[in-house]
Design a protein with these regions (language model features):
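Glycine-centered flexible beta-alpha turn that most often forms the glycine-rich phosphate-binding loop
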Residues: 301
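Short beta-strand "wing" residues that participate in macromolecule-binding interfaces
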Residues: 67-69, 188, 448
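Conserved PLP cofactor-binding pocket of PLP-dependent enzymes
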Residues: 442-466
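Conserved core of the PLP fold type I
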Residues: 155-294, 306-307, 312-320, 394, ...
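N-terminal basic, amphipathic alpha-helical segments
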Residues: 1-151, 360-366, 388, 400, ...
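Conserved core segment of the aminotransferase class I/II
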Residues: 322-392
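Conserved glycine-rich beta-strand-loop-beta hairpin in the small C-terminal domain of fold type I
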Residues: 392-402, 414-427
Length: 494
């Protein structure tokens, strides 16, 4: 087993050790059942304190990569997940002559943090209360209403080519999005809009156009894991800027810009995921000023700016863009029919032209039904009236979650009440590790997201959890928060 450490890295040493051992397990370099060096032996080899190795092994053990046996020590676990278990029983991985896909697939696509993905996907599991997923409420667009409108689209007049959308996106929808952007103070033509299925796809395509391996990219910290993973897969070096109650710290940002020339500045401007904070109007203007001064593009991601409960709605950064430096990505993931995903990008015409070309190469067709449905709802006003209902549902849910969290204050829980959006960034009592706590909570029936996954270097967030209040009904949300309380009480008793 080969492990090397960089004591000058932002990644904690124990995580460097754990990540390298995990990579070797995934690649097959450390087969199942392989013995690992003792804590003391590995500490001596790496010239680190024994407690550092203890933390690394604990990390791997908690994720079921390794196990400890009395009289034997630490060994690679027999099965890490359902697929590994299938291989142990003689599944396809055990058949002679079969390609070893683990070794064939590029390592960067294998060695990924699974915690966020696993918990996010479990929101459909009705046996658990989902306080982890960022999915729209099911209470606004009823299934009967949607089914009727889809049937009307399918049986309406027009030839069958209406079942396809041009790669740039449905023309009628793009025209309606021009008006939608106008309500946000953003001027754009339909030719400056590219329709895509979701934020992740938009980000992936834009990064493909602009970022080369070795480039630096500035991102907020904490930040949604999907955002920084796209950057990492592109080979970018991530430079992080801390977020406070007013959003991205512009003093730190300016300091970075004076030292390096990043390819992009990524900003989640409104009701930031995971903190729920909103970028102040002063900082929005300052970031545009810095972008112009240092000629660095801004990528602004927005899914929650319409979800305002307290105070005024702020214009996006894009509204202050006079040079075309801002690429604006808007997602309807929190304000439309759950499961029907749609986003769009607006920016400089040359960039959008290049983006459209990339879309035409990678996608044969786009989602016709969702585009037609959203275009119709924007046109007849249903989207805007439904938006008011989303605000009411989410505001009520937010107040319930905050009430439940206030009751946990004597236990040491703290948070800042968000003025909009769908997330509460909750600090756990001293000594409670979020990764360990969310496993206990899950076993008791509630899903949460641990804070460390929002830190690219995994060097923060171990004392935080993200709570989402958009998906569950008011009743189930309250029940889920009660389970969270019981889980926390048990955690503190140990």
């Amino acid at each position: 087993m080969k492990v090397s450490i960089d004591k000058f890295s932002k990644v904690p040493v124990y995580l460097q050790i754990a990540d390298q051992i995990k990579s070797q397990i995934i690649s097959g370099a450390l087969p199942r059942g392989s013995a690992l060096p003792s804590e003391r032996a590995l500490a001596q080899i790496l010239d680190v304190h024994r407690n550092t190795v203890v933390k690394a092994y604990s990390e791997l053990k908690s994720d079921a990569w390794i196990e400890s046996r009395q009289g034997v020590g630490y060994i690679v676990a027999a099965a890490n997940d359902e697929n590994d278990a299938q291989d142990e029983r003689g599944g396809e991985g055990a058949q002679p002559g079969r390609v070893n896909w683990v070794s064939e697939v590029a390592e960067k696509y294998l060695d990924m943090e699974k915690t966020f993905d696993d918990l996010f996907q479990r929101f459909t599991d009705e046996s658990h209360y989902s306080l982890g997923s960022g999915v729209a409420s099911r209470e606004v667009y009823t299934s009967e209403r949607v089914a009727g409108d889809i049937a009307a689209l399918l049986t309406g007049s027009g030839p069958c080519q209406y079942f396809f959308s041009p790669y740039k996106g449905d023309k009628f929808l793009r025209q309606k999005l021009v008006a939608f952007l106008g309500t946000k103070g953003v001027k754009a033509s339909s030719g400056e809009i590219q329709i895509l299925s979701e934020t992740n796809q938009a980000l992936d395509f834009i990064v493909t156009l602009l970022v080369k391996p070795g480039d630096s990219v500035v991102m907020e910290e904490p930040v949604h894991p999907d955002m920084y993973r796209v950057m990492e897969l592109a080979g970018a070096k991530i430079l992080t800027v801390p977020v406070d109650e007013n959003g991205m710290n512009c003093e730190v940002l300016e300091s970075l810009l004076t030292q390096t020339r990043p390819r992009l500045i990524f900003v989640n401007s409104s009701y930031h995921d995971p903190t729920g904070n909103i970028l102040s109007i002063e900082r929005r203007k300052k970031i545009v000023e810095l972008s112009n001064r240092y000629r660095v593009p801004i990528m602004e991601e927005d899914a929650a700016s319409e979800l305002v409960y307290d105070g005024d709605k702020l214009p996006p950064i894009k509204a202050f863009d006079t040079t075309g430096n801002v690429i604006y990505i808007y997602s309807f993931s929190l304000t439309f029919i759950p499961g029907l995903s749609l986003a769009f990008v607006t920016g400089n015409r040359d960039l959008i032209r290049a983006l459209s070309y990339l879309v035409s190469v990678r996608l044969m067709a786009s989602d016709w039904m969702t585009q037609k449905l959203l275009g119709m709802y924007l046109d007849d006003g249903i989207y805007y009236t439904s938006l008011l209902k989303f605000r009411d549902v989410y505001r009520t849910n937010r107040d319930l979650v905050c009430q439940k969290l206030d009751e946990l204050a004597p236990l040491g829980v703290s948070y800042t009440k968000p003025r909009g959006g769908v997330y509460v960034w909750c600090r756990l009592p001293d000594g409670v590790d979020s990764k360990r706590f969310i496993r206990r909570a899950y076993n008791m029936g509630v899903t949460l997201i641990p804070g460390h996954v929002f830190y690219p270097c995994k060097n923060g967030g171990r004392d935080h959890i993200r709570i989402n209040y958009s998906y569950e009904s008011y009743e189930r949300l309250g029940q889920g928060m009660d389970v969270l309380r019981k889980a926390l009480e048990e955690e503190l008793e140990e």
